[in-house]
């Protein structure tokens, strides 16, 4: 059994009957919810979904229980990070795609007028975690208007003991 995250990013996937997709995209935009991606989800053994809004979207598109299961994401403090006070270099850190989002770029430029802001576009794993820990706050700026709350990102930061400042969301009543 294979559990696949970000399935839309891979050219080749494990066999449909042996894979479960952990769906982490937002249904408020068709950027990732293409017909090909919907086919990948539908053909898979199962889909794990963190957002009730996304579950409703999937159901309206014919993909529902028993093939879709709600699995909310939560923070889990790793002992490796507990009590690791790190010197703060940045007021804010933003990580994600700021290059193709004019909305995010404008927001970040305005923030940089008054604060020290570190922008990470293509950084992952331990390198990213080290920078997050050097920040007073992680800023969460939506790619889309009316976006869902980016719980995977928020829980990742909370697990690193760094607070997150986020815009409001269309699904904030879920949290």
Where are these regions (language model features)?
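Nucleotide-sugar donor-binding catalytic core of glycosyltransferases
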Residues: 1-17, 21-175
